[in-house]
Regions:
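Bacterial N-terminal signal peptides that target proteins for export
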Residues: 2-14
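Sec-dependent N-terminal signal peptides
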Residues: 15-20
Length: 229
């Protein structure tokens, strides 16, 4: 079981989440590491909720954020090669992604650690950007409980900088359902037309009121502080 889901469902959810996070635009890159993605994209059916932005970062939180970025820059060097991340339990899920898009390598056990606090050494996922020659280290993803208030999210990653988001009211297709045509896929997943439990039940799907709580990406090798989140 992963986060209360069967392993099969968890893997399918992760694959769908990763597919939802593919965006074509690419920001400028540092010399050795990729940087951030282009944003959350369009969500016509309201499955994505964003955190409430704040106007500024208090000095103590800014110091905390700078320490976090420094720790991540130092620790993530060991995962420049995705094979090293996989050896440490970060698993690549879903299909390949196009050049320029992000790929998530998830570590299931770290989701439990993220429930209580943000540990720089226990990200829920490591992010790689697809290149013509493979994958380039980009950053990490952290999570927090869906019940976490804005003040708690702000303590972990300041809301004036970070973009916490949550995926809600998702209907996953039933196991074994054919998903080869657009009509078969359209009702389900993170961009699906189904948004209620009743409609999901009618389609014999698996309804998730949220998927792994709040999430945020951090790009510690970005050229500016604003680009790091």
């Amino acid at each position: 079981m992963v986060g209360g889901m069967s392993t099969w469902l968890a893997r399918r959810v992760f694959a769908a989440a990763a597919a939802c996070a593919i965006f074509a635009a690419c920001a400028p890159r540092a010399a050795t590491f990729a940087t951030r993605s282009s944003g959350m994209g369009i969500d016509p059916f309201g499955h994505t909720r964003m955190s409430e932005p704040r106007a500024s970062v208090p000095p103590d939180e800014m110091a905390h954020t700078q320490r976090l970025l420094a720790l991540l820059r130092n620790d993530l060097v060991q995962y420049r090669d995705p094979a090293a991340a996989e050896r440490d339990g970060f698993l690549k899920q879903g299909d390949d992604v196009p050049v320029g898009a992000l790929k998530h390598f998830f570590k299931y056990e770290n989701f439990a650690k993220n429930r209580t606090h943000l540990d720089p050494k226990a990200p829920a996922a490591i992010l790689y950007r697809r290149t013509a020659n493979g994958f380039e280290l980009a950053g990490v993803m952290f999570t927090a409980p869906i019940s976490a208030p804005m003040d708690e999210l702000d303590r972990r990653i300041p809301l004036a900088l970070g973009h916490w988001h949550s995926h809600r009211n998702i209907c996953m297709p039933p196991k074994g359902a054919p998903m080869t045509t657009h009509a078969q896929r359209a009702p389900f997943g993170f961009e699906g037309t189904i948004t209620t439990r009743a409609a999901c039940d009618a389609a014999n799907g698996v309804f998730l009121d949220n998927v792994y709580g709040w999430m945020t990406h951090v790009y510690p090798y970005a050229p500016t502080l604003a680009d790091a989140f």
